[in-house]
């Protein structure tokens, strides 16, 4: 039957005049962590005029939310240092390309603590899905 369909389509003038459409490209998934706090995701969000940072463990999906006085790299680093002191230094931290995370201060922090800082696409926020899901949950709880 497949052969019949292929023959029909190859002889069809309407079909041959249309460009070939290939399916969507396969998703490239981040590697799964093997232990807690191996990989964490971080994101900022606002709720009722107040800024927050969410930190989520990629292994367990456990997250914590901290209120920020400002959205500066210094303030975000200050909050993250508390998390790293409590849970340990991750191998990898995933964030978006927002100002605090793209700053020299944040890169210095990553180098000093020895973790890899990976940024997600600024256009495609879903690529940092763990953090985005934690933000959604946190907003509903707050």
Predicted region positions:
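Retroviral integrase
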Residues: 1-141
């Amino acid at each position: 039957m497949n052969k019949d369909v292929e023959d029909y389509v190859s002889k069809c003038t309407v079909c041959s005049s249309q460009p070939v459409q290939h399916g969507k490209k396969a998703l490239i998934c981040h590697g799964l962590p093997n232990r807690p706090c191996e990989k964490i995701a971080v994101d900022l969000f606002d709720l009722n005029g107040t800024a927050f940072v969410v930190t989520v463990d990629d292994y367990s999906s456990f997250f914590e939310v901290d209120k920020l006085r400002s959205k500066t790299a210094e303030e975000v680093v200050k909050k993250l240092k508390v998390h790293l002191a409590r849970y340990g230094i991750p191998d990898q931290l995933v964030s978006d390309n927002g100002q605090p995370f793209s700053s020299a201060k944040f890169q210095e922090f990553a180098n000093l603590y020895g973790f890899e800082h990976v940024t997600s696409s600024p256009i495609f926020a879903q690529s940092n899905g763990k953090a985005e899901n934690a933000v959604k949950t946190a907003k509903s709880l707050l």
